[in-house]
From Swiss-Prot:
Organism annotation: Human papillomavirus type 53
UniProt similarity note: Belongs to the papillomaviridae E1 protein family.
Localization (cell): Host nucleus
SUPFAM superfamilies per the UniProt record, alphabetical: P-loop containing nucleoside triphosphate hydrolases
Name under which the protein is recorded: Replication protein E1
Catalytic function, reaction form: Couples ATP hydrolysis with the unwinding of duplex DNA by translocating in the 3'-5' direction; ATP + H2O = ADP + phosphate + H(+)
Keyword tags: ATP-binding, DNA replication, DNA-binding, Early protein, Helicase, Host nucleus, Hydrolase, Isomerase, Nucleotide-binding
InterPro entries in the cross-refs: P-loop_NTPase, PPV_DNA_helicase_E1_C, Znf_lg_T-Ag_D1_dom_sf
Pfam families: PPV_E1_C
Enzyme kind, highest EC tier: isomerase
Any one biological process term the GO annotation gives: DNA replication
Job description of the protein: ATP-dependent DNA 3'-5' helicase required for initiation of viral DNA replication. It forms a complex with the viral E2 protein. The E1-E2 complex binds to the replication origin which contains binding sites for both proteins. During the initial step, a dimer of E1 interacts with a dimer of protein E2 leading to a complex that binds the viral origin of replication with high specificity. Then, a second dimer of E1 displaces the E2 dimer in an ATP-dependent manner to form the E1 tetramer.
GO MF annotations, alphabetized: ATP binding; ATP hydrolysis activity; DNA binding; DNA helicase activity
Length: 52
């Protein structure tokens, strides 16, 4: 989030993120979605593939 916020000078989406009062929620939701994605990925693999 910090590096994204630094792009506010050149990126209009980053600028909108900085102006939002829901930054913490967006970061939290992103973390949750990453966990869901990793879990789904893991469920499609066997143990050997996951460890590799």
């Amino acid at each position: 989030a910090f590096h994204y916020a630094q792009l506010a000078d050149v990126d209009s989406n980053a600028q909108a993120f900085l102006k939002s009062n829901m930054q913490a929620k967006y970061v939290k939701d992103c973390g949750i979605m990453c966990r869901h994605y990793k879990r789904a990925q893991q469920q499609q693999m066997n143990m050997k593939q996951w460890i590799k």
